[in-house]
């Protein structure tokens, strides 16, 4: 599906080499201050053009078509479009019938019977422009509640930071070309990416997301737990293969006496749960880790088949990220923001008191 969310519905549209990509955000309350500069800054963070990302250079200028009047949201659908200006579709002519390894070519073709071979169409990371735009709008609502979502890279290839989560440097990451959270490892991360690129290869990455200012009570029980919603959102990002919340996999190696977050004087003494208990936020920071596979588009010679079943060797052309996880950190923040904004709106009717408060009743 192309639509995400329950109360705050986000729909993306467009293809990598189509006319444009964009989104529609429906359900945003009226009266939220719309920060167009922030929206553009988020899109600029996601842009390629550096030696650590795709050479494809797009202006990615957002055009807000509806849902905003005199600087505030109107309560009606917000439509945002970003026109594609630098697509090189001819680079993909040799892939019309070919299935690229680790791409969605094979599965899209056999599911739909048709696929857009130009840059992958809807399966391209270009679609994440829409996600970042939608996430920026969601962040404008979260600001009203002082909820802050931050992401950065803590691992590239075999280089992984051993800093404690509270030691990750988000201020440094804001200035880093690769959103690196560990200043001591930035050069290693960069070299790993460049070495992969120079050898016609790619490399994976690990992204850390922290949400501060969390409220108690976001999320639902059982099938709409906050952690399941977050995992769903993050796993839907291109190239993501795993998500951890709190201690994540490490929790399976721990004793309950160590993993349990004790309370004293009304406060949690630790946060092994990552800010979620029983599928509902407990007010502590949300702690998330998202793991990206190596970009499947590599320039080394590869083997595959075409749609007729013929065995082929081929070499890709085009412009591709040597490490998709770097820009993926911006997308991770966007998806988390969309989930939290949706949960905030859902929580407004979670119990009778909340509902009465919405109408000024006691």
From Swiss-Prot:
GO terms for biological process: amino acid biosynthetic process; aromatic amino acid family biosynthetic process; chorismate biosynthetic process. Reduced FMN (FMNH(2)). It is an enzyme of class 4 (lyase). FMN binds at residues 122-124, 238-239, 278, 293-297, 319. Keywords: Amino-acid biosynthesis, Aromatic amino acid biosynthesis, FAD, Flavoprotein, FMN, Lyase, NADP. Pathway: Metabolic intermediate biosynthesis; chorismate biosynthesis; chorismate from D-erythrose 4-phosphate and phosphoenolpyruvate: step 7/7. GO terms for cellular component: cytosol. NADP(+) binds at residue 46. This reaction introduces a second double bond into the aromatic ring system. This is Chorismate synthase. It comes from Campylobacter jejuni subsp. jejuni serotype O:6 (strain 81116 / NCTC 11828). The lineage of its organism: Bacteria, Pseudomonadati, Campylobacterota, Epsilonproteobacteria, Campylobacterales. The gene is aroC.
